[in-house]
Amino acid sequence: MLPFPPGAILRDVLNVFFVALVLVRFVIDRKKTYFPLVFTIFSWSAVILWVIALTIFSPDKIQAIMGGRSYILFPAVFIALVILKVSYPQSLNIEKIVCYIIFLMFMVATISIIDVLMNGEFIKLLGYDEHYAGEQLNLINSYDGMVRATGGFSDALNFGYMLTLGVLLCMECFSQGYKRLLMLIISFVLFIAICMSLTRGAILVAALIYALYIISNRKMLFCGITLFVIIIPVLAISTNIFDNYTEILIGRFTDSSQASRGSTQGRIDMAINSLNFLSEHPSGIGLGTQGSGNMLSVKDNRLNTDNYFFWIALETGIIGLIINIIYLASQFYSSTLLNRIYGSHCSNMHYRLYFLFGSIYFISAALSSAPSSSTFSIYYWTVLALIPFLKLTNRRCTR
C-alpha cells in the first residue's frame, strides 16, 4: 500500500485543476494585477523549475514527485484565490468561505475533544483508520500515555497549528463586530482542542492571539473572563481527565517531565545534526526524502529535523531554501499590500493581524514540519489570501 491514500490523490488533482484553470483564465483574459502578485507568480515559477530540475536528477522519481507537491501545490492556492478575488471580484463570497472554515474547524475541534474524552475511540467509531497509509506511517497521536487531539487529521502537531488559524479568524470576526459571542465561544472550543493536542507551539500562538486582541478590545476581555469562569469549572467537574492534561501541559512548558526534557533536547540535537550535514552537503539529501515519500525508498534517507526550514534545505538544498523563502515571503507581502488596499483596518491594526500570521508560520516551521502538510499549509495560505478582503461591517476601523 502506498503512503499516499486516495483522498490525498484526489485533493492534489483538484488542487492542480483549480490553480491551472484560474491561471489559464487569467492569462487568456489578459487581466492586469498588482506588481507584488506578479512577482509572486514568477517566484512560484522559480520554485517549479527548481523542483523539476531536482526531480529529473533524482534517482527515485516517484519519491521526488511526492516531495515536490508540497512546495508547488499547497501554497499555490494563495495565488489562485487572490487572482479570483482581484480580477473577478464577484467570483468569491469571502464572508461565506470564512464562516465555512470556522464552522469546519469548530466541528473537527469538537470531534477531537470528544475523542480525547473517549480515550481515542470516538474517531474510530466514525470510521477513521490510523493505518490509512500503511503500517509504516507513524502518526503523532499520543504523548506520555495520553491521547492527543487530532480530530481524525492524523497528526496532532498539524492539527494544533491548523486550529490556531481558526482562533485568529474568530478573533478577527469579533474585532469587526461580527457575531461576537458566537465567535468567542467557538474560539474557546478551538483553544481547548489545541491544548488537548499538547502542541506547545500552537498553544503559545493561540495565547498570543488572545493577548493581542484583548489588549485592544475591552469587550473581549470582559466576555472572555465571563466565559472562562463558566466553561472551565463545568469541564473540570465533568471529568478528571483535565487534571492529567493540566499536569502534562505544565510539564511540556517547564520540562519537568522526562518525556518533555527528551523532546526539547531532541530538537536541539536534530538542529545540530542538520546544520552539520548541510555544512558538508549544501545540496541536501534529495527531494522527497524527509516526508512520506521516504517510505517508498529502499534506503531510509530521512534526517529528523522537526524544523521546516531544515526540511526544505535537506530536500532542495541551500539554493532551494532561498528560492522557497523568497516565494513564501512574496505571498505574505502581497497579502499585506492587498490588506492596505481592500482591508477594513485603519491606523496600525493590520500590523497586529500580520504579526500573528507571521508568528503562526514561523513558530510552526521552527518547531515542526507542519507547513509541509496539507492539513496546515492549504488552510494557512487560503486564510492569508482571503483575510485582506474580509469586511464584516461597514466600519473602516477595527476597534
Curated annotation (Swiss-Prot):
One of its GO terms (cellular component) is plasma membrane. It is found in: Cell inner membrane. Its EC number is 2.4.99.27. GO terms for molecular function: transferase activity. The chain crosses the membrane at residues 4-24, 37-57, 64-84, 97-117, 151-171, 185-205, 222-242, 309-329, 353-373, 374-394. It comes from the Bacteria. The keyword Cell membrane applies. The keyword Zinc does not apply. Keywords: Cell inner membrane, Cell membrane, Lipopolysaccharide biosynthesis, Membrane, Transferase, Transmembrane, Transmembrane helix. It catalyses: n lipid-linked O-antigen repeat units = a lipid-linked O antigen + (n-1) polyisoprenyl diphosphate. Pfam families: Wzy_C. It is a multi-pass membrane protein. Pathway: Bacterial outer membrane biogenesis; LPS O-antigen biosynthesis. One of its GO terms (biological process) is lipopolysaccharide biosynthetic process. InterPro entries: O-antigen_ligase-rel_domated (IPR007016), WaaL-like (IPR051533). Polymerase involved in the biosynthesis of the lipopolysaccharide (LPS). Catalyzes the polymerization of the O-antigen repeat units on the periplasmic face of the inner membrane, leading to the formation of the lipid-linked O-antigen molecule. This is O-antigen polymerase. It comes from Salmonella muenchen. The gene is rfc.
